[in-house]
Design a protein with these regions (language model features):
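Receiver (REC) domain switch/output surface
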Residues: 113-124, 159
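AAA+ ATPase active-site-proximal loops
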Residues: 135-178
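Two-component/phosphorelay signaling modules centered on CheY-like receiver
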Residues: 10-34, 42, 47
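Short amphipathic alpha-helix used as the core "switch/output" element in two-component signaling
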Residues: 38, 53, 57-76
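C-terminal output helix
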Residues: 35, 87-90, 104-117
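His-Asp phosphorelay/catalytic-motif detector in bacterial-type signaling
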Residues: 44-46, 73-79, 166
Length: 178
């Protein structure tokens, strides 16, 4: 099941955001940095919405940025969507530069937020699928050719050897032989 962590200190927004997703996604809510880190470790969410204005610096973004750094260190595969105020594009851009996947500007619009969160889930799914496919090839890639079977790997190695070897006999055009 998809897992979403909502980090928001405003109880009204918490309940609105939870309402947007609770029927299709496992949702956990945290109001501050410590509870967010506890929930992150407990539920291992694929997607996290993070309000940058968290206590004790609810008017600023320092606590949100500190939490973003910790999330990216502890759960680098999670997709973080930074939630900002309408006039706060500068912090949103800074968060993207730090490694957040996307941003969403308040006020809450359930349709747009749902779209942004579902897009983040899809990106997380595609990245996981890509990691699994790479694992299935056991790193068996030769110069951009992906082969899974041992026989194909042997053919690729032979081609690689021949491609870089110098011919011992000069190549003579066909018409010179007649």
């Amino acid at each position: 099941m998809k897992r979403l962590l909502i980090v928001e200190d405003d109880p009204g927004l918490q309940s609105q955001m939870r309402w947007c997703f609770s029927d299709q996604i496992e949702v956990s809510v945290a109001a501050d940095r410590d509870s967010a880190l506890t929930a992150l470790r407990r539920m291992e969410p694929q997607v996290i919405t993070l309000d940058l204005g968290l206590p004790p610096d609810a008017g600023g973004a320092s606590e949100g940025f500190a939490l973003l750094e910790e999330i990216l260190r502890l759960a680098p595969m999670s997709k973080v969507i930074v939630v900002t105020g309408r006039e706060d594009k500068e912090n949103a851009v800074k968060a993207i530069g730090m490694g957040a996947s996307d941003f969403y500007q308040k006020p809450l619009d359930a349709d747009i937020l749902t779209f942004v969160v579902n897009r983040a889930f899809r990106l997380a799914e595609l990245e996981q699928e890509n990691r699994e496919l790479i694992g299935q090839t056991n790193g068996a890639s030769i110069k951009g050719i992906v082969a899974a079977s041992p026989e194909m790997m042997e053919i690729c190695r032979t081609i690689e050897k021949v491609a870089y070897s110098r011919p011992r006999l000069p190549l003579i055009p066909d018409e010179a032989c007649h």
